[in-house]
C-alpha cells in the first residue's frame, strides 16, 4: 500500500453517517452505558441502533451511526467507552 492509498482512506470530517460498533460483556446496563457515552460526545442517530448477542450470550454488540466531527472526538469516544469497564472493543 502506498502513501497515496493510505491518504485516500482518511475520513473526511464532518462525517454525518459514521458507523460505531461496540463489543462488550452482556449485562443489563451495557447498551445504556454505550448510548450515554456516545450522546455525551456526539450527535447520535438512534434510529440506526442495532443490538446483537453472541451465540453463547456472553457478549453483546451495539452498532449505530454518529456524526463524527474530528479524530480527537473519535479518540475521546473510544477512551470513554473503554473506561466504562463493559467494553472490550470499539470498531
Curated annotation (Swiss-Prot):
GO cellular component, one term: cytosol
InterPro entries, alphabetized: UPF0250_YbeD-like (IPR007454), YbeD-like_sf (IPR027471)
Recorded superkingdom: Bacteria
Pfam families hit by this protein: DUF493 (PF04359)
Similarity annotation: Belongs to the UPF0250 family.
Protein name: UPF0250 protein PSPTO_4820
Amino acid at each position: 500500500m502506498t502513501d497515496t492509498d493510505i491518504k485516500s482512506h482518511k475520513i473526511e470530517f464532518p462525517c454525518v453517517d459514521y458507523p460505531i460498533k461496540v463489543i462488550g460483556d452482556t449485562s443489563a446496563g451495557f447498551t445504556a452505558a454505550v448510548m450515554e457515552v456516545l450522546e455525551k460526545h456526539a450527535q447520535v442517530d438512534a434510529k440506526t441502533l442495532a443490538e446483537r448477542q453472541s451465540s453463547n450470550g456472553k457478549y453483546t454488540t451495539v452498532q449505530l451511526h454518529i456524526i463524527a466531527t474530528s479524530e480527537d472526538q473519535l479518540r475521546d469516544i473510544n477512551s470513554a467507552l473503554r473506561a466504562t469497564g463493559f467494553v472490550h472493543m470499539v470498531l
